[in-house]
Amino acid sequence: YRLQLHAGFTLDDARSTVPYLAGLGVSHLYLAPVLTAVAGSAHGYDVLDHTTINPELGGRPALERLAETCHRHDLGIVVDIVPNHMALVSQQWRNAPLWEVLRDGRESAHAHWFDVDWNHLGGRFGLPILGGSLADELAAGSLQLDVGRPDEGGAAGQPVLRYYDHVLPLSPEGPSQG
C-alpha cells in the first residue's frame, strides 16, 4: 500500500495507519521518498541529502518507530530511495554534492554521482538557467560576481556568481580559459 509522505503526513502519521492497514490484509507499506528534500516538498523527489531521513517527516527516529510498528503487525516496508533524483534549487549550496561539482568539476568527490560529459563545453559543467543569451544577460547586468554571505551556508565566504535567485559557486582557482 503506497503512502505519500510530506510535512502534512509524516512517518508518525503513517505509523498510526499500520493497525488499520494490517487488518485489511496489506502486506507491505510502500513509502514515497523519505530522504531530506527541499523544504515543503509535496513529493520528496527533490532530494537535497541522500544520507539523511527528512526531518520534516520526523527524521530517522520516526522511521525507526514506523519500522518497529510494522514489524509488530507483520508488515514489510518498501522505500523509494530515489538515488537518481536530486533537487536543483536556486541556492545550490543547499545541495552539497551539486555545489561541489559546480565548484570543483571532475575533481569533486561527488563528480561520479552525475552523468556529465566532461568532454563537452571544454570540460566544464553546463547548467541551463539563463533566461537569455549570455551576451544579453551580461549586457543587462544580470550576472553578479560576489562573495557568499554568512547566512548562505556552504556559500559563506566563497566566491559566487549571482543570477537572480541563483547562487552559484566559482572555482577557487578562478575562471578557466577557453
Can you say where each PLM-predicted feature lies in the sequence?
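Acidic/aromatic-lined carbohydrate-recognition and catalytic surfaces
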Residues: Y1-G178
